[in-house]
């Protein structure tokens, strides 16, 4: 019975992830019967797009798997990263909106601990930990980790505070005494740094769980010509709050969603880098019991329903499903996902005012 329970919990956590470092360590945690503490940190930096739903759904999975989960509202991190013009009031307002989005997206927020980075930064012991982490990380390693901010290593030349950011992220994990660190693949370097430094400090190594990054609606561009590392490439091709046409936002209207998906990069028979298929896989089919209905005229094959992503991908790669039919089906299903979230945010006058103030200040 215990083994079955561990497998069920592991499978729930592992689904729709890119990697777990390491799977054996995670299974060991689940089998131990001990309290497991996990977290994700995010920058409250603007209006959430649907790519954020990927990690929000994974938070739900972890909570339902019995993990004691915290969400770090990385306000000071956002300030260092020049988000929202460095206006801490706007940054905190953005955090309040994200909480509402999580709740409307079905995350059991009553079982999640929300932590403002101010809580950490106000403790002198936290800064002592940052210094100890810095003593055990080379400057070159820290510079390479700047991609976790959506920045390139050379951008540290402009503002030295950028170098503190990776050290803070590693220290967050140690300060909160975490067993699991969740993040997108763009956070991998910080998590690997944390695992390396943990050994040097005699601390437990966090299990790193990495979720996929939803590609820009505009496609990969010159990704195939890039000589950068995977983190750099991901930063270039993912949905971005500062580039509205690359993303669907959780407050977009039905018509905007249809328009954006209709224009999205979606080459026939191609899976890699296809944002429409990624939305289907990581957002739509991530929900239990979801069925994608494709309505099309009889002369093009007639209506068809897909109860699994694997069925959808097979028909698409075989050419039995046209890109336009895929787009139309995904758009209509995505509208159903976004509609209650949009209503929860825009239906609250205070949230709506905060959103309007934030929208004009979104920065790279």
Curated annotation (Swiss-Prot):
Sequence motif 'KMSKS' region, residues: 238-242
CDD domains reported in the protein's UniProt record: TyrRS_core
GO cellular component: cytoplasm
Binding site for L-tyrosine: 39, 165, 169, 172, 187
Assigned keywords, A-Z: Aminoacyl-tRNA synthetase, ATP-binding, Cytoplasm, Ligase, Nucleotide-binding, Protein biosynthesis
Gene3D superfamilies found in the cross-reference section: HUPs (3.40.50.620), Tyrosyl-Transfer RNA Synthetase (1.10.240.10)
UniProt-annotated location(s): Cytoplasm
InterPro entries the UniProt entry points to: aa-tRNA-synth_Ic (IPR002305), Rossmann-like_a/b/a_fold (IPR014729), Tyr-tRNA-ligase (IPR002307), Tyr-tRNA-ligase_4 (IPR023678), Tyr-tRNA-ligase_arc/euk-type (IPR023617), Tyr-tRNA_synthase (IPR050489)
Function statement: Catalyzes the attachment of tyrosine to tRNA(Tyr) in a two-step reaction: tyrosine is first activated by ATP to form Tyr-AMP and then transferred to the acceptor end of tRNA(Tyr).
Protein name per the record: Tyrosine--tRNA ligase
Organism whose genome encodes this protein: Aeropyrum pernix (strain ATCC 700893 / DSM 11879 / JCM 9820 / NBRC 100138 / K1)
């Amino acid at each position: 019975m215990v083994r079955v329970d561990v497998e069920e919990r592991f499978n729930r956590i592992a689904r729709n992830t890119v990697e777990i470092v390491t799977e054996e360590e995670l299974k060991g945690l689940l089998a131990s019967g001990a309290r497991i503490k996990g977290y994700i940190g995010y920058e409250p930096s603007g209006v959430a797009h649907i790519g954020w739903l990927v990690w929000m759904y994974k938070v739900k999975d972890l909570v339902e798997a019995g993990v004691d989960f915290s969400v770090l509202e990385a306000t000071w991190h956002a300030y260092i990263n020049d988000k929202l013009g460095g206006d801490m009031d706007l940054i905190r307002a953005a955090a309040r909106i994200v909480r509402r989005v999580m709740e409307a997206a079905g995350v059991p927020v009553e079982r999640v601990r929300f932590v403002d980075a101010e809580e950490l930064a106000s403790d002198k012991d936290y800064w002592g930990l940052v210094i100890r982490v810095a003593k055990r990380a080379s400057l070159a390693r820290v510079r390479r980790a700047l991609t976790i901010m959506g920045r390139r290593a050379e951008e540290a030349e402009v503002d030295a505070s950028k170098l503190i950011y990776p050290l803070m992220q590693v220290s967050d994990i140690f300060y909160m005494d975490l067993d699991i660190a969740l993040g997108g693949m763009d956070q991998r370097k910080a998590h690997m740094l944390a695992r390396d430094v943990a050994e040097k400090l005699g601390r437990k190594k966090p299990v790193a769980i990495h979720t996929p990054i939803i590609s820009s609606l505009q496609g990969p561009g010159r990704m195939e010509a890039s000589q950068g590392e995977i983190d750099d490439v991901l930063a270039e091709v993912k949905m971005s709050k500062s580039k509205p046409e690359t993303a669907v936002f959780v407050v977009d209207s039905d018509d905007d969603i249809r328009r954006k998906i209709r224009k999205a990069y979606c080459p026939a028979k191609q899976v890699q880098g296809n944002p429409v298929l990624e939305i289907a896989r990581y957002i739509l089919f991530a929900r239990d019991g979801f069925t994608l209905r494709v309505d099309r005229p009889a002369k093009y094959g007639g209506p068809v329903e897909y109860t699994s992503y694997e069925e959808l991908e097979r028909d698409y790669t075989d050419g039995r499903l046209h890109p336009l039919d895929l787009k139309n089906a995904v758009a209509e299903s995505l509208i159903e996902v976004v509609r209650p979230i949009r209503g929860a945010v825009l239906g609250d006058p205070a949230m709506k005012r905060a959103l309007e103030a934030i929208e004009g200040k979104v920065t790279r």
